[in-house]
């Protein structure tokens, strides 16, 4: 794993062990998949930047950008996060209530899917 990915895991999952790590070389740039012992799945870009995190048990809210957390708390009280997907232009979250929200780089809501 690239250094930034290792640091992300050590910082956000202290003491948690990995059960699976894979490098996908089939793309123009390698991508990495990490599955933690608690079932959380993380995906990282070739540079080690987080691109996706998912867990059926829920993702700790502190791993989600504050603006998105606040929006969800305000509009979907009680909903948790089960997936967070990052790409160059958007952030997408899937909630425990099955709502899917897409935000632009300025954290403005641009799409909702239920």
Predicted regions and their residues:
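Interaction-mediating elements
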Residues: 1-114
């Amino acid at each position: 794993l690239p250094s930034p990915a290792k640091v992300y895991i050590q910082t956000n999952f202290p003491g948690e062990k990995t059960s699976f790590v894979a490098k996908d070389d089939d793309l123009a740039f390698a991508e990495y998949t990490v599955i933690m012992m608690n079932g959380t799945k993380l995906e990282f870009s070739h540079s080690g930047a987080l691109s996706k995190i998912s867990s059926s048990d829920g993702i700790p809210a502190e791993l989600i950008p504050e603006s998105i957390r606040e929006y969800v708390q305000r509009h979907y009280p009680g909903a948790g996060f089960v997936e967070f997907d990052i790409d160059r232009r958007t952030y997408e979250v899937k909630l425990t209530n099955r709502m899917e929200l897409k935000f632009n780089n300025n954290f403005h809501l641009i799409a909702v899917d239920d």
